[in-house]
Amino acid sequence: WLKNHKEPLPSGVIAMSPWTDLTISGESVETNFEKDPLFGKTRDSMLYNKDYLGDNDPTNEYISPLFGDYEGFPPLLIQVGSYEMLLSDSTRVAKKAKEAGGKVKLSIYEGMFHVFQMAMLLMPESKKAWAEIKRFLHYLDTEENEMQNISKEEKA
């Protein structure tokens, strides 16, 4: 919306386990159905849910960002778990943004589930994800580092 209405864009975007395709067309919706402890149990409501969509087109870019234009998009950090039904949403948005010339860091956390980052101090993967977010914010603030350096862990 901001870009389409010529409003200033944020310096960067952090997307944690984003749901970017409400057409539910991603391969991982099926392949990760039994692995995803959060969305797996609600798959049918995802597939047939009209509460959110109403009569709106699920390919509308404001509803499903996957279908948006990523040219001129700010740097993007996407974090997603490998067990998420929404994994394909993240990989496809990352690909689309890169193809549009954007700076994108896609981090797939092995064995993790939807919004695993919210476990904060309970899991090492969550701690690692928050440290990556900190490095991304530093990158946005200084622009001294390359995007690929965001995943490098700090030395203790």
Description of each model-found segment:
Residues 1-156:
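Alpha/beta-hydrolase superfamily serine-hydrolase fold, recognizing
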